[in-house]
A protein has these predicted regions:
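Ubiquitin-like/PB1-type beta-grasp interaction modules and other compact soluble beta-rich domains
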Residues: 1-126
Length: 126
């Protein structure tokens, strides 16, 4: 889960984060309970038959039944484009998405990031 992938896609109007990722050929897998609103796997990571290997939970295998484990999950981050940057505005900075990927509306210029979080360690993109 340490591989970085970056893609820039041209869009002309509003699109959901789920549609954006599908158009970029990323494979998203949701959970049995929450469907595609929750990202359980991204490009088959974490692997469905291999322990995640997170310290303190070395033998845990993610089954994608309900919410992913609090110690190992994909964080969905968004960054809103703005014409004139305002340092006091959260727009233009990476922030936690407030809705699931199937509902998260993205517009031209917005950014979307998925960061695999282990034991609460979130590494926000630059």
């Amino acid at each position: 889960q340490n591989d970085d992938f970056e893609k820039c896609l041209p869009v002309t109007g509003e699109i959901t984060a789920l549609e954006l990722m599908q158009n970029a050929n990323f494979k998203l897998e949701g959970t049995n309970k929450y469907g595609n609103n929750v990202v359980c796997r991204l490009n088959n990571l974490p692997k469905p038959s291999t322990p995640i290997g997170v310290k303190g939970h070395e033998d845990y295998i993610e089954e994608c039944k309900e919410m992913p484990a609090a110690f190992a999950y994909w964080a969905v981050l968004e960054k809103r484009w703005q014409v004139i940057p305002n340092p006091f505005d959260l727009n233009g900075k990476w922030a936690w998405a407030q809705v699931g990927v199937a509902e998260l509306a993205m517009k031209p210029g917005d950014g979307l990031a998925f960061v695999f979080v282990t034991n609460g360690d979130v590494k926000f993109p630059d």
